Amino acid sequence: MIKPVRTMLFDLDGTIVDTNELIIRSFLEALKGVVPEGFSREHIIPSMGLTLSDQMKIFSGLEQVDHLIAAYREVNYRLHNELVKPFAYVGEVMDHLQKQGVRIGIVTTKMRLSTEKSLKFVGLYDYIVPDAIVTIDDVKNAKPHPEPVLMALDKLGVEPADAIMVGDSPVDMQSANAAGVVSVGVAWSLKGAEKLRESGAKHVIDDMRELYAFAGLEREKLAGR
């Protein structure tokens, strides 16, 4: 285990907020008539974590994908409240971490508008330091580049060695490692724990409550797991 940290950065989708089905449904509906018959969730999951633009280019084979992005966002907005929920223990853990003085930031490839919408909808927004929400709108280089992680740390006035980055995607692990931050993968990732380890995850957790140990808090909080 690393020395206790007082700053934790989190990816959003698939890490603390379960938007997996929303994302998959949005792609499938937006890409109808564009992708070959048989295109399914199994084709989508490996690229989740990349920017929406990059994913649409990969799936469609097109360079100009603005119309597909617009279609995706329409579906995503329409189904958001029906399909989005927090993962187990996320609210409990963030509440306890915040009360113990741990500062929490978000590093995501989503737009700011949709990021804040999801955080507020699932009741997590108040646990986050607002200035430390870094979205695709804020950076020139998205994950796996280190820029988003470094920007969040700069907003918090924290050195890389004093923080961890928690995520569900290879690009989260790569961005964290490139920034000099300890990378922590979540085993509930659709990509699987082994894929995160292969991508450089220094740790993989099976339960959000395992994060208490990274802040030097008592592990008895895991009771009842």
Predicted regions and their residues:
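Asp-based, Mg2+/Mn2+-dependent phosphohydrolase catalytic module
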Residues: 1-8, 95, 111-112, 116-225
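N-terminal helical cap/lid subdomain that shapes the substrate entry/recognition surface
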Residues: 2-100, 116
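Conserved phosphate-coupling serine/threonine residues in phosphotransfer and NTP-handling enzymes
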Residues: 15, 108-110
